[in-house]
Amino acid sequence: MPSLQERAESTLRQEVIGIALQEIGVREATGNNDGKRVEEYLRYTGLGKGYAWCSAFVSWCYGQAGLIEPRNPWSPALFPNARTYCRGDACGRPITLTQIKPADIFGIYGQSVRRINHVGLIKDIKGKYLRTIEGNSNNRVESKRRHLSTIYAVADWIGGGR
């Protein structure tokens, strides 16, 4: 039987995912990182319209669930060592697959900028694929299916890392 802490963590994870699911379909007004709701995500992290907002969206979802962290608009900042449990090829290893939980944050590495440049929430994992909820994807919030080979890092902000 799961401990009280494990049950509370599971409930919180589902709350974050539920909040994110309600945002699916939110679109930018003009395709320039703008629009009423997009600007709300950005304001939550201290920015105004016109900035990339994938990290702001993730932070906003956590905030709506009552969590004070993460609250950062810069994607790489969501992956401190203490919270990150896989990087690079390690994310596809069998031991890591059992660690991935709903509301963990995934990061995609951008070769051109040589850092994580896109993030989102993990809804669940099916085989070697993550089902995700991401902001600033095709100018909107959407759910996607991503192969683990495309994932550079995974961080846990609810369970405190592993």
Regions found by a protein language model. Name each.
Residues K128-R162:
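Active-site signature of cysteine proteases
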Residues E40-Y44, F79-R83, V141-S143, A153:
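Short, surface-exposed, charged/polar-biased interaction segments
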Residues F57, P102, H118, D124, ...:
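Secondary-structure boundary/capping motif
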Residues S10-G18, L47, L67-N139:
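...with weaker cross-activation on analogous glycine-rich loops/strands in unrelated enzymes
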